[in-house]
């Protein structure tokens, strides 16, 4: 469905009340008759899980595909484990040494399971017609780190800079084409997950992440296609570089103070965050409600803040805790 996303964003910022967009695809899968593994191998089943999440939480401002971030690495040849009701995980890196980068082939943007996620967007837009639909994919440095293995990639940015740039370049080339594929089939935007960049220093993040993210944003973002950049690391000192990518939405994890982040991020973009998935898993509804109320109070003066989780929520999280989060939001909105 074609939506002017600049208007969508502006309406959220100008609204009196606060909105919410938690990343909770996986806990909503049990609302269908399918397992997690079934939904990430079948676009129609994934779309039904997306619709189930909207039916369960009807005020969410958008719908998202499953945050299966193994998809991109799998396209490059990684071995992926698929538990029946857990998030897929990369078991083995594709390359182990920097000198292997030159021979690494960039896969077609429709290889692996990519088209399942494209099918999910197409099918979801038949079921969800009143709000945007977002696809999900990794960011360039995070994909590069998955391909090489994180600890080796973190060393390579120091000891093998040329090869690491070549690897991030190949990741970016693939991710641009994948983002274009989402845009071509009618998605309203992407959730670009770049968590591994949060481990880098601000200088290294600018060199190995921000400039490549900007290329993805420049290739696809316009008034009808919206990029939300996610980094759940300790990125308080990286906000200028993140904003410089040109993305129009920024999603933060619980490693940062959202009051500080909202102050640093200009109010012409949306800022999402940041209840910890671990807390949503381990704590009860009363605690979650209190934590949400505290977060909302901390961000009260920032109209560009959107309540969310700090990252994707594991399948085991009880939906009663999401209910508690929304209950706190509804009570807060009565005071604004």
What do these predicted ranges mean?
Residues 1-29, 36-37, 106-336:
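Active-site loop segments of alpha/beta catalytic cores
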Residues 23-26, 49, 65-70:
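Acidic/polar N-terminal loop/beta-strand segments that form early-domain functional surfaces
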Residues 29-31, 62-64, 71-83, 143-144:
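Short active-site-adjacent helix-start/loop capping segments
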Residues 34-45:
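Surface-exposed strand-loop-strand hairpins of Gram-negative outer-membrane beta-barrel proteins
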Residues 46-66, 181-188, 244-247:
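Catalytic domains of carbohydrate-active enzymes, especially glycoside hydrolases
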Residues 70-107, 130:
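A contiguous, low-structure linker/loop signature
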């Amino acid at each position: 469905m074609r939506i002017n996303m600049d208007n969508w964003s502006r309406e959220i910022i100008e609204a009196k009340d606060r909105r919410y967009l938690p990343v909770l695809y996986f806990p909503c899968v049990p609302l269908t008759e399918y397992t997690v593994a079934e939904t990430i191998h079948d676009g129609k089943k994934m779309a039904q899980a997306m619709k189930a999440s909207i039916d369960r939480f009807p005020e969410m401002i958008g719908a998202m595909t499953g945050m299966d971030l193994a998809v991109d690495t799998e396209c490059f040849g990684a071995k992926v484990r698929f538990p029946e009701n857990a998030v897929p995980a990369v078991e083995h890196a594709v390359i182990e040494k920097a000198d292997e980068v030159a021979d690494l082939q960039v896969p077609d943007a429709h290889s692996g399971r990519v088209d399942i996620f494209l099918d999910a967007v197409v099918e979801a837009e038949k079921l969800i017609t009143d709000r945007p639909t977002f696809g999900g994919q990794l960011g360039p440095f995070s994909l590069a780190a998955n391909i090489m293995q994180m600890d080796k990639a973190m060393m390579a940015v120091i000891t093998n800079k040329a090869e690491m740039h070549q690897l991030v370049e190949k990741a970016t080339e693939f991710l641009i084409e994948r983002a274009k594929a989402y845009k071509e089939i009618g998605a309203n935007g992407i959730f670009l997950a770049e968590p591994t960049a949060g481990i880098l220093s601000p200088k290294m993040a600018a060199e190995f992440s921000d400039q490549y993210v900007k290329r993805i944003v420049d290739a696809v973002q316009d008034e009808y296609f919206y990029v939300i950049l996610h980094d759940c690391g300790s990125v308080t000192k990286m906000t200028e570089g993140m904003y410089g990518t040109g993305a129009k939405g920024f999603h933060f994890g619980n490693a940062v103070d959202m009051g500080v982040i909202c102050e640093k991020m200009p109010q012409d973009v949306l800022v999402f965050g940041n209840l910890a998935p671990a807390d949503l898993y381990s704590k009860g509804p009363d605690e979650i409600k209190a934590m949400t109320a505290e977060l909302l109070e901390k961000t009260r003066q920032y109209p560009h803040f959107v309540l969310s989780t700090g990252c994707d929520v594991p399948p085991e999280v009880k939906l009663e805790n999401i209910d508690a989060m929304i209950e706190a939001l509804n009570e807060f909105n009565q005071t604004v």
